[in-house]
């Protein structure tokens, strides 16, 4: 009989208290057993407390190089920050600088190691590494990210291998998926060469669409044998989170999908085991 494992991960844990509240609810009422904590998030300390109160929640490090706040002083990582001392707004801006050779890899290493050190100081038993907007899979950055994981004695990493042609929604989305697919294949080879554990399959948002209840049920209906990670960004209040995160995302829909009775019923009916990164073989 096929073995089905579901690994739902809440990204951006610690970014905002309303995200932390959603993570808490999704653990207590739904199928969430994994979250990745943003070291520079404004609600970092709040998220740490949520994690301490929910030991069943596997917590990883959400390496951040865009759309957030650095752990290092801006003067120590000048190629990574704007004149305001924050990261570039999004992956597009970062990649533009990256392709022009304007991102110093020593700055990347310094910042990501500082993020790892901050996570280590929490004393939480960490499970894995991933990143905000998939930046850890860029050439060169993947090598540093794996080094960061190793420095924390971690041997599990997200590789965002998204199918190219499922649920096609236009050329823009296809281009985004093609880029992510290429980076993921290159990153997977490096991760496997260093004996990192990686989920067998990956689902979640690409080009902005939320994993609402219907989408989640579709993922479960077509679940493949092995471990499938579903990347999600739950939150409790779109009206506050959209401007706070500068992202037109349906945080509430993803929270509702995770706690949905229909989702829980399908998980039970298909005998799917809900896991986190600790359970990866």
What are the roles of these predicted feature ranges?
Residues 1-8, 17-128, 140-281:
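Terminal accessory/targeting
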Residues 136-138:
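Active-site pocket-lining segments that scaffold enzyme catalytic pockets across diverse folds
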Residues 131-133:
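Active-site histidine-anchored catalytic micro-motif
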Residues 12:
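His/Cys-centered metal/cofactor-coordination and adjacent catalytic loops
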């Amino acid at each position: 009989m096929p073995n089905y494992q579901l690994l739902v991960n809440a990204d951006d844990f610690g970014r905002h208290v309303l995200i932390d509240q959603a993570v808490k609810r999704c653990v207590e009422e739904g199928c969430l057993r994994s979250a990745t904590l943003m070291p520079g998030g404004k609600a970092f300390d709040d998220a740490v407390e949520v994690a301490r109160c929910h030991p069943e929640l596997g917590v990883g490090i959400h390496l951040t190089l865009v759309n957030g706040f650095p752990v290092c002083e801006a003067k120590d990582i000048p190629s990574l920050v704007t004149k305001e001392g924050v990261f570039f707004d999004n992956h597009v801006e970062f990649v533009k600088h990256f392709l022009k050779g304007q991102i110093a890899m020593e700055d990347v290493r310094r910042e990501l190691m500082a993020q790892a050190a901050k996570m280590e100081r929490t004393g939480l038993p960490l499970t894995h590494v991933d990143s905000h907007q998939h930046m850890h899979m860029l050439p060169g950055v993947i090598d540093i990210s794996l080094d960061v994981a190793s420095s924390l004695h971690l041997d599990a990493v997200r590789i965002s291998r998204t199918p190219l042609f499922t649920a096609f929604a236009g050329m823009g989305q296809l281009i985004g998926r093609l880029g992510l697919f290429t980076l993921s294949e290159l990153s997977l080879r490096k991760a496997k060469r260093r004996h990192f554990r990686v989920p067998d399959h990956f689902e979640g948002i690409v080009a902005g669409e939320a994993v609402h209840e219907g989408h989640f049920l579709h993922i479960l209906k077509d679940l493949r044998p092995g471990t499938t990670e579903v990347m999600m960004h739950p939150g409790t209040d779109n009206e506050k989170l959209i401007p706070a995160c500068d992202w037109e995302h349906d945080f509430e829909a993803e929270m509702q999908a995770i706690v949905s009775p229909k989702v829980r019923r399908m998980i039970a009916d298909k005998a799917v085991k809900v896991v986190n990164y600790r359970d990866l073989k």
